[in-house]
Amino acid sequence: MSVDLAFDEQELLPAVAQDAESGDVLMLAYVSEEAVARSRETGYAHYYSRSREELWKKGGSSGHTQEIEEIRVDCDGDAILYLVEQAGGACHTGYDTCFHRTLDGDIVGEQVFDPEEIYE
């Protein structure tokens, strides 16, 4: 890597995925050094699951992949931004973005798939 990344004590960084065309924020997840390397190698977003403690490719089971157009790093090197072309919905709940609710609980996003049909 040509930029130093400041991984936290768990050796992770927060990663925001943003639709490269619309600018919509799709999701927030975490990446390890291996996830960043795999994303660069394949051109598809990879993340690190803190709950499963494993590397995962976005869309690996759903087919709703994120093709990376560019990876950006914030000024402190402690967060990254994936600019992506999203295939299908970004959220495992079936919505186009994980940010589909207001703080008051109003739904502002669009449900684009039924998660029960994808995740059995």
From Swiss-Prot:
It catalyses: 1-(5-phospho-beta-D-ribosyl)-5'-AMP + H2O = 1-(5-phospho-beta-D-ribosyl)-5-[(5-phospho-beta-D-ribosylamino)methylideneamino]imidazole-4-carboxamide. Keywords: Amino-acid biosynthesis, Cytoplasm, Histidine biosynthesis, Hydrolase, Magnesium, Metal-binding, Zinc. Homodimer. It is found in: Cytoplasm. It comes from Natronomonas pharaonis (strain ATCC 35678 / DSM 2160 / CIP 103997 / JCM 8858 / NBRC 14720 / NCIMB 2260 / Gabara) (Halobacterium pharaonis). Pfam families: PRA-CH. Pathway: Amino-acid biosynthesis; L-histidine biosynthesis; L-histidine from 5-phospho-alpha-D-ribose 1-diphosphate: step 3/9. Its cofactor is Mg(2+); Zn(2+). This is Phosphoribosyl-AMP cyclohydrolase. GO terms for biological process: L-histidine biosynthetic process. Catalyzes the hydrolysis of the adenine ring of phosphoribosyl-AMP.
